[in-house]
Regions:
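Compositionally biased, low-complexity flexible segments
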Residues: 1-33
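Intrinsically disordered, low-complexity polyampholyte segments enriched for Lys and acidic residues
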Residues: 5-8, 38, 481, 491-492
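Nucleotide-activated sugar donor-binding and catalytic core shared by glycosyltransferases
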Residues: 8, 32, 36-279, 283-444
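Low-complexity, intrinsically disordered segments with a bias for serine/threonine
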Residues: 24, 431, 477-479
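Serine/threonine-rich, low-complexity intrinsically disordered segments
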Residues: 25, 31, 448-450, 462, ...
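Short linear proline/tyrosine/threonine-rich motifs used for host-factor recruitment
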Residues: 445-449, 455-459
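Membrane-proximal basic amphipathic "stem/tether" segments
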Residues: 454, 465-514
Length: 514
């Protein structure tokens, strides 16, 4: 990939700088001892998202609001990283993705499945990302944050690369925005990895990620969705009868064309209800829906894009729409059952599986029976109440606060995953087995801080054998002198890199082994 080398050097120049006055010469180990006391007025926090749809930015906004309530944070800045890149890159990431969703959803599903295993991303893709994000790297460098929180995998990878090259000293937290864990999000090094549910955490642990680095937070949503509200007052604001169940039909921010089909079916319903149709940014869709409900306007309220979705969710009885990570989490936080339509292959299909499994949603596999599904639920108030209770049970309205507070509890240093350990995790994921069931030489060992028990690095047992580690070893001494002796041996280069990361400026250190 000779053609890419100049651009890789460009990225390296963007992150290269002399150590700042607050960066101890000893590297991350020495730095950790003083963190987070470098800024006497509080921490500098950077929240990075990507505007591929609205969800990643909404999660980032929820975290930003939660951080604003905490006394330890001096400054918090939120950046949509796509806004720092060139127009072609933005269109590829955003417009290109939604074009595939509309015209070739099977490609989206294939892409999701192909990157479902961790550490599988092609070098060419990494090079392309680096080429187009040099401006972002400079912004991160200039802001010099203590804490970086990422709600998209792209900035997480870039920040991890800066940490690995010792060009940034900060705590990195990665926050997933769907109910399942996708391996594309896993990077190294990082401090905290936040997932939406227990099964996702269990899956990550089975692949060898230390459990102390995985936190089940839920997906951050705007605060207050679970709060009690004056239903009558909100209903009056929208011209709704509080005595009737309200069906909230969402086209999403982009205005999904499927909405018109749903409205036509619901219009023929004989159940007593009112419907609020949110058409997003599509003015044409709003006009089409207005025309479709002509003559029955007392049952329908047609809106364009609105910032009042939270209030509408609080007073509604049923939500009809796509199972995006954020919209689904908002519904669950509000105790609002869902009728799921048109899930995008990959993450939205998995979100739908989870919601149906938990009894908080039903899924429409036929576009012709959406009205039938809605009628069935409206005719069975007991079932609707049970679904609402299930939604509240799995909802996590305080996920933003959970992430903010936990991210500030900085561990001693980021977790390092060696290249051989990455290969083992990838292999286990592709074979569909826990990493513990791999052959003995590829099994993973976690190096820990003997004083705190915190995980510091993951390596294969075979890698550690030159340091005298056996399958029954409970600790390992790692002297810099031994690493120097191994550096000319190609088979041990990965161990040398891992050891140098762990030692920082120390000559020798003893680590626990699990």
């Amino acid at each position: 990939m000779a053609a890419g080398q100049p651009f890789d050097r460009r990225f390296r120049r963007a992150v290269r700088r002399r150590p700042s006055a607050r960066t101890p010469a000893g590297g991350p180990t020495a730095a950790a001892a003083r963190y987070p006391y470098d800024h006497p007025m509080g921490l500098r926090t950077l929240i990075l998202a990507a505007g591929v749809g609205a969800g990643h930015n909404q999660a980032a906004s929820a975290i930003e609001q939660a951080l604003a309530e905490l006394p330890d944070v001096d400054r918090a800045q939120r950046i949509d990283i796509l806004e720092t890149t060139n127009e072609a890159f933005q269109k590829l990431y955003d417009d290109g993705y939604f074009a595939l969703v509309a015209e070739a959803p099977w490609v989206v599903g294939w892409g999701y499945d192909s990157q479902d295993s961790p550490f599988k991303l092609a070098p060419l893709v990494q090079w392309w990302d680096q080429l187009n994000t040099t401006s972002l790297v400079r912004q991160i460098r200039d802001y010099d944050p203590d804490l970086v929180i990422c709600t998209h995998f792209l900035p997480a990878r870039l920040v991890a690369l800066m940490l690995a090259r010792r060009q940034l000293r900060a705590s990195l937290s990665v926050v997933t925005t769907d109910y399942d864990f996708q391996g594309l999000w896993l990077t190294t090094p990082f401090n905290h990895f936040f997932v939406a549910r227990d099964e996702a955490a269990e899956h990550m642990a089975s692949l060898g990620v230390p459990r102390d680095r995985i936190l089940v937070s839920g997906i951050p949503v705007q605060p207050g969705l679970a709060d009690q509200v004056d239903t009558a007052a909100i209903g009056e604001r929208f011209g709704l009868d509080p005595e009737l169940p309200i069906v909230l039909i969402s086209a999403g921010a982009s205005g999904g064309s499927y909405t018109l089909n749903i409205v036509r079916q619901v219009r023929r319903s004989e159940q007593r209800f009112q419907a609020v149709v949110v058409c997003g940014h599509s003015e044409q869709l709003r006009k089409d829906v207005d025309a479709a409900v002509s003559g029955t306007s007392e049952r329908f309220r047609v809106l364009g894009y609105t910032t009042e979705m939270a209030d509408l969710m609080r007073i509604s009885s049923l939500f009809v729409g796509k199972p995006g990570g954020l919209s689904s989490s908002e519904c669950m936080a509000a105790g609002l059952p869902m009728v799921i339509i048109n899930p995008i292959p990959g993450q939205e299909v998995r979100n739908a599986d989870f919601l149906v499994e938990e009894g908080a949603a039903v899924r429409c596999n036929y576009s012709t029976t959406v009205g039938y599904k809605i009628d069935t639920l409206l005719a069975d108030p007991e079932r609707l109440r049970a679904m609402a209770a299930n939604a509240r049970r799995i909802g996590r309205p305080d996920a933003g606060r959970t992430v903010a507070k936990a991210a500030l509890e900085v561990l001693t240093q980021p977790l390092w995953i060696s290249r051989e350990a990455q290969k083992a995790m990838l292999s286990a994921s592709e074979e569909g087995i826990p990493v513990a069931d791999l052959p003995a030489e590829r099994r993973l060992r976690t190096l820990t801080d003997p004083a705190t028990g915190a995980s510091l690095a993951v390596a294969t047992e075979a890698q550690l054998r030159p340091l005298g580690v056996t399958s029954w070893s409970t600790s390992v001494r790692m002297p810099r002198k031994a690493l120097r002796a191994l550096r000319w041996q190609p088979d041990n280069l990965d161990l040398v890199v891992t050891g140098r990361w762990l030692l920082g400026g120390e000559r020798s250190r003893i680590f626990g082994l699990t």
